[in-house]
Amino acid sequence: MKAQDLRQKSVDELNQELLGLLREQFNMRMQASTGQLAQTHTLKQVRRDVARIKTVLTEKAGA
């Protein structure tokens, strides 16, 4: 997910995507703690995607 693509979305779309990613991150954390998560690198990707969305939301709020 690129920040440039995120900037084209509306605030409502970004909030929905953020909520979905946070749920996904929670589920991944639970899987990682029980040893069921095979691809641990996805945790890092989701965390960075959340940060990108939050950054774009902050940019839109300031504009």
From Swiss-Prot:
UniProt superkingdom: Bacteria
SS bond partners: none
PROSITE patterns: RIBOSOMAL_L29
UniProt GO cellular component terms: cytosolic large ribosomal subunit
Keyword Ribonucleoprotein attributed: yes
InterPro entries: Ribosomal_protein_uL29, Ribosomal_uL29, Ribosomal_uL29_CS, Ribosomal_uL29_sf
One GO term (biological process): translation
Gene Ontology molecular functions: structural constituent of ribosome
Keywords, in A-Z order: Ribonucleoprotein, Ribosomal protein
Keyword Iron-sulfur: no
PANTHER family: 60S RIBOSOMAL PROTEIN L35/50S RIBOSOMAL PROTEIN L29 (PTHR10916), LARGE RIBOSOMAL SUBUNIT PROTEIN UL29C (PTHR10916:SF0)
Family note: Belongs to the universal ribosomal protein uL29 family.
Matching HAMAP family: Ribosomal_uL29
Protein name, UniProt field: Large ribosomal subunit protein uL29
Originating organism: Aeromonas salmonicida (strain A449)
Organism lineage: Bacteria, Pseudomonadati, Pseudomonadota, Gammaproteobacteria, Aeromonadales
